[in-house]
C-alpha cells in the first residue's frame, strides 16, 4: 500500500512539473517494498558513502549549476535532507576531483602573494576572485595559506613570557575565542595561538593552582618564583609549592638559623628489638630529646644580595625540614641485621667498608665534612646522633637546588654524610653520638 502511494505521488508531481527529475534511488525494488537510504537523516551528521555517490551523479547531470534541484535529488524528507548550501560545500571542498588537497608549491605561494597585492581592498582581499587564478584551490585554502604562512606581518619567533601571560589572562576571560584573543597579540595568528595554547601553555598551566594567574594584569610584572616555574618546563609541582611556601614565610619575621631535627636519640632507647619497633616509645623519645638535636644554618650577611640569600636559605630550610620529617632512621641504624630488600642488599654489597685504623675514627673536619658544589654560596653545619654495637656501614645523601635572583637554577648542593664511630668509643665498647660538620 505504501509503495502504491509513493508511486502515485511521484507520478502526480511529474505531471505538474515536467522538468523535475525523479530522485535517484528513491524507490527500492518491489521485493523489499521500502524506501532505501541511510537510517540517519540528521543534516548535522557526517556524509555517508551513498549520499556522496548520489551527489556526484547529480552534479555531473546538472553540471554543478542548479544546487537547489541537486539537493532535492538526495534521499530523505524535506526537513531532514541536505540543503543546497551543504551540497555545494561538500562538492567544492571534498568531492570535486579537480580540487588540490596537497601541500602548496613554491610557485603557488609566489602567485598567491602577487594576487593578494593586486586584489588588496581595504585589507580584505576577495578570496573568491583570487582562487579563480589558482587552479585547484578554493577561497578558503587561499585565505588560510595567506594568514597562517605568507603574511609578512606574522611573528614566527618563539613566544615571550609577556605574550604567554596575555594569552593566559585572555583565555580566562574569552575562552577559546581565538579571533578575539588574536586582537591582543599582534603578529600572532589565530591558528598559532590555538596550537600554542593546546600544545604548550595549557599542559604547563595544569600543574599550578587555578588562582595562580587570577591577579595578572596586562603590563604588570608577575612574581618571580611562580613566573620561573611556569616558564620552565623542567620544574616540578613540588618545587613550585615550596617556592610559594617560601614567599609566604618571607612576609613574617624569621630567625637567621635553621632548627633541624634529624631523628631519634638512640642512646636513650632500649636496646631490645621491640623498642625499635614500638611507635609509642619512638615518638616519646623524639619529644624528649628533640631540643638537643638542633643544627644551625646561618644566613650569609650580604647587603647586595640580601633578598636572594633569604629566598635561597628559606627554601633550603623547607627542604631540610621535609627531609627530617621523612627520615627513616630505623631502616638505616639497626643493631641487628633485619631482612633487607634486594635493593638494600645490593647497596650493602657494594658499599665500601669503613677502615678500622686509628686515623679513620678521628672526628676531624677532614673525616667528617660536607661537600658542596663550586657554584653554591653557603656552607652547612649539620649534626646527627647514632648508637650501635658495631660500626655503621651506611651513607646519607641529600641534594638541594639553588636559584639566583632571576629565578634560574645556578647550582646544586650535595650532602654526603658518612657515620663513623670515635676511637675512644671503640675501646670502651660504646658508640657515642658525635657532631658531623
Swiss-Prot record:
Entry's Gene Ontology molecular function annotations: DNA-binding transcription factor activity; sequence-specific DNA binding
UniProt protein name: Transcription factor MYB3R-2
DNA-binding region(s) from the entry: 67-95, 127-150, 178-201
Entry keyword set: DNA-binding, Nucleus, Repeat, Transcription, Transcription regulation
Compositional bias of kind Basic and acidic residues: 1-12, 358-369
CDD domains given in the database record: SANT
Gene Ontology CC entries for this record: nucleus
Domain of life where this protein originates: Eukaryota
Pfam families assigned to the protein according to its UniProt record, in alphabetical order: Myb_DNA-bind_6, Myb_DNA-binding
Compartment annotation: Nucleus
Function per UniProt: Transcription factor that binds 5'-AACGG-3' motifs in gene promoters. Required for proper circadian rhythm.
A biological process from GO: regulation of circadian rhythm
